Swiss-Prot record:
Residues 17-33 have a biased composition (Basic and acidic residues). Residues 1-33 are annotated as: Disordered. The gene is PB1. This is Protein PB1-F2. Plays an important role in promoting lung pathology in both primary viral infection and secondary bacterial infection. Promotes alteration of mitochondrial morphology, dissipation of mitochondrial membrane potential, and cell death. Alternatively, inhibits the production of interferon in the infected cell at the level of host mitochondrial antiviral signaling MAVS. Its level of expression differs greatly depending on which cell type is infected, in a manner that is independent of the levels of expression of other viral proteins. Monocytic cells are more affected than epithelial cells. Pfam families: PB1-F2. It comes from Influenza A virus (strain A/Turkey/Ireland/1378/1983 H5N8). HAMAP family: INFV_PB1F2. One of its GO terms (cellular component) is membrane. Belongs to the influenza viruses PB1-F2 family. Keywords: Apoptosis, Host cytoplasm, Host membrane, Host mitochondrion, Host mitochondrion inner membrane, Host nucleus, Host-virus interaction, Inhibition of host innate immune response by virus, Inhibition of host MAVS by virus, Inhibition of host RLR pathway by virus, Membrane, Modulation of host cell apoptosis by virus, Viral immunoevasion. InterPro entries: Flu_proapoptotic_PB1-F2.
Amino acid sequence: MEQEQDIPWTQSAEHTNIQKRESGQQTQRLEHPSLTRLMDHYQRTMSQADMHRQIVSWRQWLSLKNPTQGSLKTRVLKRWKLFSKQGWTN
């Protein structure tokens, strides 16, 4: 009994999954409840941030009144350079 208490919950969950597979029962992935909540929160936060980013870019686009072809080209190039820099730093 003491040995099982020393095993981290991740290993014990993997062990349980292997046992279930070998016995032919339906496998169920066991995760730590706080980890599941954390991942749900992360996904919600990231999707909200992505939506906000899209809304901001659309507002910027709509705020341009009678844009000339040159001003649009400059604007797009600036955005592309900024995006490229972020891509390389990450």
